Amino acid sequence: FLAALLLGVALAQGDVDPREEAKRQKELLLSTAGILPTELVVMQGEELFHRKGPSGKTMAECDFGLGKGVLEGAAARLPRYFLDTNRVEDLDSRIVTCMTRVQGFKPEEVKRDEVVAVAFYIASKSTGHKIQVRLLFPEERELYALGEKLFWARSGARDVGCATCHVSYVGRRAGVLPYADVLGKDKSWTHWPAYRYSNDQTWTMQDRIRACYGNIAHPQPALYSQPILALELYLAYPANGAVVEEWPAFVR
């Protein structure tokens, strides 16, 4: 009901700036409900972060890039290479590593909604920080190169890819929203994770990428897979220096 109400109001407003529209919907929701969905999910994520796993440890024992339990600004530096796993990880996959390697959960016990909630909580600690994603290790450079290849690739029955929408057709509309300049001025990397008020969903960039693939009728990469991590790194690196205005964000 909430999503339908907000979407109805948005559509009635016609062709408006997406960011200004999001601000209006956010204010409307805050005035009617008294709290934002993002805040509720962050609180849930905080509880999960401090929950003990089968090993008796909480996520405070995990290193998200700046040392055990250090969260301030950590998400703004991801994806990055981690020595303990010998691979590049983003926030989502690092949370899974934490839950399985440190907390003792079995892979099949890791719930996606819990990963997203914890991602919202950890990301909230990077609000106001600048994006600082590096390409220092060979693993990072190799994954970035894969991300570049995937971003510019065209395939499928429609002969389209990421760059079709987000380079060639920037500013044009296929629906309500214009295609974002994800490699340039829009700094789209700083827009996720986010609450999508149009469909009442909580998404990280992994979910956003999978949805994009679905929109162009391509098979969706698996969660936490190399293709998703590669595209994330390719999107994050150009955003270096951009300030995270608000994580988790509130978007259409």
Residue locations for each model-derived region?
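Intrinsically disordered low-complexity regions specifically enriched for long asparagine
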Residues: A10-A12, E47
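Solvent-exposed, charged amphipathic helical/linker segments at domain boundaries
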Residues: H129-L146
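Electron-transfer interface patches adjacent to heme c in soluble/periplasmic c-type cytochromes
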Residues: G14-L40, H50-F64, K68-A117, S124-G128, ...
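An amphipathic alpha-helix/helix-turn recognition signal
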Residues: L40-V41, E142
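Hydrophobic, well-structured mid-protein blocks that either form specific transmembrane helices
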Residues: V118-K125, R134-P138
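Bacterial N-terminal signal peptides
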Residues: F1-V9
